[in-house]
């Protein structure tokens, strides 16, 4: 049964929404990125509320299975898109669904495994699906024709499946693709907890040392949750947790409680890089011997937000694992929503011993904004496709400020697939 505090939290949403609306039209809100959009501010309120629930209370708002979301909810609103995707909604194995299953796949054709966020205790949301499908629709036709996409249907901690259940499920699907089928071009794309699982899986592969091991050829990390429990000393001015506590979807109080983290990780060791990629103390050599990160033939994309609580921990991880020193060279928080390549973009190509890298800090961006707050791009795509006189939308014609994350991920995939 849902706890009293959880019930009161959910029942209080309408009251908090009313207060938010009054503030929006009077004194203003701390959500800088969406200060001119009441709709987005209300959505942010709902997302903050969901993440604030205990792991067990989250069970009562995670009642929709991925099967239901993929095959009922998304087609209900976007049938014109899903009906044209080959293999959409069919199972690959017990742990995954195809979003796109290209016919006549070759072993070197790319297969992207999308690993959804939600703290390991919240289910995939239609918003995330809309953004992922928007990315696919904007990829160049010749690249699109070869790209297949899987959704990892991992079990939730709120249903009694703590970590490493999710790691084991990913490994089972990965082995099916690589060992049993011989696929050689696997991409991992994860947001938040999905980013955590993607990075932890690299450490898992490193430790297992399987024969003829195939590492992911590409990694797309969207606001990866690299440090599961914030340190006690982060709530000081100048730290992203403190500065963005009122701006972001994520707040210190949501994961500062050790009990909540234990309910997610089970008996997992928070000092293990498989569980907590941002565990400290860490060393550069912890991330050596992982081709995905250390070989220029591999590609990595990372995005975080200036107004994101996880920002500092993500940039700390980038320093140790990717040799990117932005966290020590720049101070964030004063971009005035203007993109400046210096400090907010880091691109590296063809450096010996290092992967091809694109790292972005979105001005005023918040946690997971490209999947939860850019999903309305799918409506523009549908409108364009409904007019037979118009050609398909090109990513270069999309507003790259409104759709900051999606446009850059698509450009990355267009250039690297």
Model-identified regions with their sequence ranges:
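A glycine/proline-hinged amphipathic helix-loop "lid/cap" segment
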Residues: 1-101, 417
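Alpha/beta hydrolase fold serine-hydrolase catalytic domain that processes acyl esters and thioesters
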Residues: 2-5, 115, 168, 179-186, ...
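Short, surface-exposed "cap/lid" segments of acyl-processing enzymes
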Residues: 95, 99-144
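Conserved beta-strand elements of the Class I
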Residues: 111-113, 150, 301
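Alpha/beta-hydrolase active-site loop signature
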Residues: 119, 154-158, 226, 366
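Catalytic nucleophile-loop/oxyanion-hole region of alpha/beta-hydrolase
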Residues: 131, 145-185
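Gly/Ala-rich beta-loop-alpha elbow adjacent to hydrolase catalytic centers
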Residues: 190, 194-198
């Amino acid at each position: 049964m849902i706890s009293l505090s959880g019930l009161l939290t959910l029942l209080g949403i309408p009251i908090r929404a009313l207060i938010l609306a009054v503030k929006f039209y009077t004194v203003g809100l701390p959500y800088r990125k969406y200060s001119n959009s009441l709709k987005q501010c209300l959505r942010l309120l709902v997302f903050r509320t969901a993440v604030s629930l205990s792991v067990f209370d989250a069970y009562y708002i995670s009642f929709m299975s991925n099967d239901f979301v993929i095959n009922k909810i998304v087609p209900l609103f976007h049938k014109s898109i899903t009906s044209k995707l080959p293999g959409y909604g069919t199972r690959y194995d017990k742990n995954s669904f195809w979003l796109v299953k290209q016919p006549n796949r070759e072993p070197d054709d790319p297969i992207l495994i999308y690993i959804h966020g939600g703290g390991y205790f919240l289910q995939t949301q239609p918003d995330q699906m809309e953004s992922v499908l928007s990315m696919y629709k904007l990829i160049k036709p010749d690249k699109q024709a070869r790209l297949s996409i899987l959704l990892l249907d991992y079990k939730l901690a709120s249903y009694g499946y703590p970590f490493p259940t999710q790691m084991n499920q990913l490994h089972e699907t990965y082995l099916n693709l690589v060992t049993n089928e011989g696929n050689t071009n696997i991409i991992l794309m994860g947001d938040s907890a999905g980013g955590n699982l993607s990075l932890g899986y690299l450490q898992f592969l490193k430790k297992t040392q399987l024969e003829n091991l195939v590492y992911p050829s590409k990694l797309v990390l969207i606001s990866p949750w690299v440090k599961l429990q914030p340190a006690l000393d982060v709530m000081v001015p100048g730290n992203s947790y403190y500065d963005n506590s009122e701006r972001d979807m994520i707040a210190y109080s949501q994961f500062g409680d050790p009990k909540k983290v234990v309910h997610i990780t089970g008996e997992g060791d928070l000092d293990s890089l498989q569980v907590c990629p941002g565990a400290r103390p860490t060393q550069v050599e912890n991330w050596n011997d992982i081709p995905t990160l250390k070989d220029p033939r591999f590609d990595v994309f990372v995005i975080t937000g200036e107004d994101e609580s996880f920002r500092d921990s993500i940039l700390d991880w980038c320093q140790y694992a990717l040799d990117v020193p932005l966290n020590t060279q720049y101070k964030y928080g004063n971009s005035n929503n203007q993109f400046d390549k210096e400090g907010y973009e880091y691109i590296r190509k063809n450096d010996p011993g290092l992967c091809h890298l694109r790292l972005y800090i979105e001005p005023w961006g918040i946690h997971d904004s490209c999947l939860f707050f850019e999903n309305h791009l799918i409506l523009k795509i549908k409108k364009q496709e409904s007019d037979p006189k118009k050609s398909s939308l090109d990513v270069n014609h999309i507003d790259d400020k409104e759709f900051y994350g999606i446009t850059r991920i698509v450009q990355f995939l267009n250039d690297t697939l």
